[in-house]
Amino acid sequence: MKAILRASRIGRVILRYRLDALLEGTPAERWLRLAKPFVPRASAEIAAQSRGARLRLALQELGPIFVKFGQILSTRRDLIPPDVAEELTLLQDRVKPFDGEAARLIVERALGLPVSVAFAAFDTTPLASASIAQVHAATLPPDANGLRREVVVKVLRPDIERQIDADIALLHSLATLVERTHPRADKIRPREVVAEIEGTLSAELDLQREGANASVLRRFWEGSDDLYVPEVIWSHTAERALTLERVYGIPSDDVAKLDAAGIDRKALAAKGVRVFYTQVFRDNFFHADAHAGNIWVDSDPERRLNPRFIALDFGIMGQLSQEDQYYLAENFMAIFHKDYRRMAELHVEAGWMPSNVRIDELEAAARSVCEPYFTRPLSEISLAEVLIKLFRVAQRYELTLQPQLILLQKTLLNIEGVGRQLDPKLDIWAVARPVLERILRERYSPRRVLGELRKRLPEIMTHAPDMPRLVHSWLKQQVEGRHQLDIRSSELRALDLSLRKLQTRVVTAITGSGLLVVAAVLYGLHPDGWYLGTVPVWSWISGGAGSAALLIAWLRR
């Protein structure tokens, strides 16, 4: 019954904001048409708004869970029109705070201690309130030196899980209906979108997980002059309550306050871009909700000329697979070099597109997207926009993207927006390019490769004895399969030639991999004999030969 009442309320809001056109051609539209005479007409003010603005206002009226839904949907620029996505980015996750005494009770249940014991002081008036949780100022009891540390306590809203479960169940029902009836359901993929929203909200409901995210990010940026991450107070953290050290700063979009504090905005903007690319390509752990409200600037007067960002809210973090990291970095470098052929090849090699796509068509599509950008001044070029438009054009060729890549697009867009607010003349390409080049050099340097091999040495030692038998078995199967091939036409001869080349490449690659394994084993065993630096000479020889074999295999593609 509650679900029916909730659905009817959603229907009324859809009609009042004139959003029924979004459901055109579905059974829902027919039901809404029947209900239309009983719903008050939209005001002239609402009717004059764009469709994106009307959707934003409707989501705000439906409540905090739908606000969160809209914020997540705004990241799916591969699914929704640009004008709607832009409006949804304006959604503000600010709601009326819940009672401070209720927050106190939640903290006590979470920590298993009275608040008066856990904290020397706890302010029941929240500092900030959002749809999932709200934040309270507090002070820890004195430590061994008698110091009382200022902290903030993030507390989940009461019964928020039940409310989210009910709304998500309704969204699943609506998604199933849309998938069965909407003419563009294969492009919209409604159930996939709802599943992504459900996963994001579930992650945000576990504050202990958010604390772990903050702890990992802090470890990566310990002692940095570019980014500060508050310390997690684990003794006062649980699933429904997260305690962090209290930090003071200026929101990164408050230009007037930054100028009044004498902050070097130009240096700060460049740092923001460098921090983002370092998080993505060095650490593979990036803050995926990096809007101005979650990114502050350290207000310490001593940091005016060497400013530092402060990260807040670690509920949504992003990671890419190693393959996506590599292909994305290579894609950016191909954009820098205007190498459209390579961009097209990378989209296929990464598995984002089917292997039977015509590379020349994809190359032409990439050229049509990128060339107009290169006529602009460098300060007006947005890498995020280029990437989003490339992926949107590639959808015509059955592009498949992982949610983490879509999350990265949105984060890159946010970071560029913050950077351009701080420094309107920021040349994002000039800042990003050397960072990417350095990271790619370091990522594939011999030292790093040997380090990775040494880290995997136990696994390699376990499987190494089986390698000769497996290689022999595989080669035997290939030879037998080749002898059974009956050459009947020029096409089959070409196929036979391709297979032989492939076999040669595979054998070369296996040989190279085996030599690298030998190099890693020698490096890990520390044998007697000659050394070059800290690495045995035979390890250098084996590693060099293995690398050469892999390079030959790669060049024979």
Curated annotation (Swiss-Prot):
Record flagged with keyword Metal-binding: no
Query: What's one Pfam family here?
Result: ABC1
Q: Where in the cell is it found?
A: Cell inner membrane
The UniProt entry, under InterPro entries, shows:
ABC1_dom (IPR004147), Kinase-like_dom_sf (IPR011009), UbiB (IPR010232), UbiB_bact (IPR045308), UbiB_kinase (IPR050154)
Keywords from the UniProt entry: ATP-binding, Cell inner membrane, Cell membrane, Kinase, Membrane, Nucleotide-binding, Transferase, Transmembrane, Transmembrane helix, Ubiquinone biosynthesis
Domain Protein kinase per the UniProt entry, residue ranges: 121-509
The active site is formed by 289 (proton acceptor)
Pathway the protein takes part in: Cofactor biosynthesis; ubiquinone biosynthesis [regulation]
Q: Does the keyword Flavoprotein apply?
A: no
| Assigned EC number | 2.7.-.-
Q: Which enzyme type, at the first EC level?
A: transferase
Record SUPFAM superfamilies: Protein kinase-like (PK-like)
**GO molecular-function annotation terms?**
ATP binding; protein kinase activity
Task: Give the UniProt record's GO annotations in the biological process aspect.
Answer: regulation of ubiquinone biosynthetic process; ubiquinone biosynthetic process
Membrane topology classification = Multi-pass membrane protein
| Residue sites binding ATP per the record | 127-135, 154
Which ranges does the record mark as transmembrane? 506-526, 535-555
Q: Which GO terms describe its cellular component?
A: plasma membrane
As for family, the record states:
Belongs to the ABC1 family. UbiB subfamily.
Q: What does this gene product do? A: Is probably a protein kinase regulator of UbiI activity which is involved in aerobic coenzyme Q (ubiquinone) biosynthesis.
Protein name in the entry: Probable protein kinase UbiB
Origin organism is Xanthomonas campestris pv. campestris (strain ATCC 33913 / DSM 3586 / NCPPB 528 / LMG 568 / P 25)
Point out the gene that encodes the protein: ubiB
